[in-house]
A protein has these predicted regions:
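N-terminal catalytic scaffold of extracellular/periplasmic and nuclease hydrolases
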Residues: 155-311, 394-467
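C-terminal motif of bacterial Sec signal peptides marking the signal peptidase cleavage site
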Residues: 20-23
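Active-site His/acidic residue clusters
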Residues: 273-281, 326-330, 337-374
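Loop/turn elements at helix/coil->beta-strand transitions in domains of secreted/extracellular proteins
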Residues: 43-44, 74-75, 85-88, 164-169, ...
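Bacterial signal peptide processing site
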Residues: 25-27
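Solvent-exposed alpha-helical segments and adjacent loops
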Residues: 29-158
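Bacterial N-terminal signal peptides that target proteins for export
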Residues: 1-9
């Protein structure tokens, strides 16, 4: 018995020693395969971000740090640009460093710039686009083990990396017509949660088209408009997830479940609002709130759909709560290796346009921008992501008057077309088109792998070439 115990102890010691040696060997191998950037070992660099800038820059710096740790078990330091300049720096965003002044590239949309100078590297991109720069930098220069990487000493302009999509994000600005998206050209209100932007972020997207929004009732309401975007069918006003014959029709959230993907429904409106309901229930009257609530609970149980709604906030501290909701939901749905479908609605553009309150409408477009930025950060760090922004309808007939001042001309929905902004592989299908709103969901479904989604008897998925 003692002999057996002794042999067992010897075996444990041998295995433990082998494990330690293997671990050391791996760490040594990883340290020797670390790349150099313009002749300087990666371990000599410090990451620097703009202390006075937007949070996107700090998050991009933290992303680079985390990827270096993951790839090489090397923990680079992060400092802000108020601290002493180091010998070799990776500069993230427009800092006070001299290299940032040298870079100062003219970029448009989702373009970003990279420059190397005197042993340091600088990355710049407008607002959240710095995330695309950080991802590109890591994938292009840091994943090549034992490589001698050279970065140009003149500024180079790049586009985000995209891959075949498995994640699909649909962002809906309720009531957001053309001039709601152009509101920054006419107004300049002080909003404490803005990025200081002077444009709707959709205009940074590479592909822009438009859609027609009429329902079978004529001018659409949000129920029929939401159903068109969710299910690919024209239906009557007040109908949620059902066709003209009151038959249930499959939504993109249900399609995601069938394809093994996760699904999420988000809105600043309560969950029983018309748009989130269009993506989660099949009911003949949008006003049946108790029935909608029960049906949504059943959808969560049956399909695993994450329904996260109801946050109408108007201050900087509270807006961050919306960002937290977005990040949390993205973390949950992206845990599925098959990908996800997620719909997010900014509901209050519509509500304030009904009230003809242009200042509040402006604030809601800014608030929508904040959410869009968070979704786009995710898309840049996860390039297998397709993002589309649109509206279910326009509200208020917002137009410039003869003096060039924006004015409401109505207090209800209008027949006006709405814009489509698209990003990711497949987004080019929407460039310059004027289509029926149902074709948006037809095309998203096709990109997900289902060519025959919705009612395509007249208007088909753009993947089939019918515009």
């Amino acid at each position: 018995m003692k002999t057996k115990i002794s042999l067992l102890l010897i075996l444990i010691i041998v295995l433990s020693t082998f494990s330690i040696l293997t671990s050391c060997s791996k760490k040594e191998a990883q340290s020797t395969t670390m790349p150099t950037i313009n002749g300087v070992s990666l371990k000599e660099y410090t990451i620097v971000y703009d202390a006075q800038g937007l949070d996107y820059n700090k998050r991009a710096a933290e992303y680079i740090k985390s990827k270096v740790l993951e790839l090489y078990q090397l923990e680079l330091s992060i400092i802000d640009d108020d601290e002493t300049t180091q010998a070799h720096e990776i500069i993230v965003g427009e800092t006070s460093r001299a290299i940032s002044e040298s870079l100062n590239a003219e970029t448009e949309g989702f373009e970003f710039a990279i420059l190397s100078d005197n042993g340091s590297v600088a990355l710049e991109g407008d607002y959240f686009v710095i995330a695309a720069a950080a991802y590109y930098f890591v994938e292009t220069y840091l994943t090549i083990a034992d490589a001698a990487v050279t970065i140009e000493e003149t500024a180079t302009i790049h586009q985000p990396i995209t891959k075949e999509a498995k994640n699909f994000i649909l962002l809906i600005g309720d009531g957001m017509g053309v001039y709601q998206t152009r509101i920054f050209e006419y107004m300049d209100y002080d909003v404490d949660y803005s990025d200081g932007e002077k444009l709707f972020y959709g205009y940074m997207f590479p592909y822009i088209g438009s859609s027609r929004t009429e329902s079978l009732s004529g001018i659409t309401d949000s129920a029929a408009g939401g159903t068109a975007l969710a299910c690919g069918y024209k239906t009557y006003n007040k109908y949620l997830g059902i066709d003209e014959n009151m038959s249930p029709i499959k939504s993109l959230t249900e399609l995601a479940y069938e394809l093994g993907k996760s699904a999420g429904v988000m809105s600043t409106e309560v969950s029983t609002g018309a748009t989130p309901s269009s993506f989660s229930v099949h009911i003949e009257d949008r006003d049946q709130s108790s029935d909608i609530s029960q049906a949504q609970t059943e959808a969560e149980l049956k399909y695993g759909t994450i329904i996260d709604c109801g946050y109408d906030y108007y201050t900087a501290s509270r807006i961050h709560l919306i960002e937290n909701h977005v990040v949390s939901t993205l973390e949950k749905v992206s845990a599925n290796e098959n990908g996800f479908f997620l719909m997010y609605e900014e509901a209050y553009i519509d509500k304030h346009c009904h009230n003809n309150d242009i200042k509040r409408a402006y604030e809601m477009v800014v608030r929508f921008n904040q959410a869009i930025a968070r979704f786009m950060e995710f898309a840049f760090y996860n390039p297998e992501t397709f993002v589309l922004i649109t509206a279910d309808h326009e509200t208020g007939r917002l137009l410039p008057d003869e003096n060039g001042k924006l004015q409401f001309n109505f207090d209800d929905h209008s027949e006006a077309d709405v814009l489509i902004f698209a990003y990711g592989q497949g987004a080019e299908l929407f460039d310059g088109v004027n289509i029926e709103n149902i074709q948006i969901s037809h095309t998203i479904a096709a990109l997900m792998g289902e060519e025959n989604f919705g009612d395509q008897s007249v208007y088909q998925s753009l993947t089939k070439g019918n515009k």
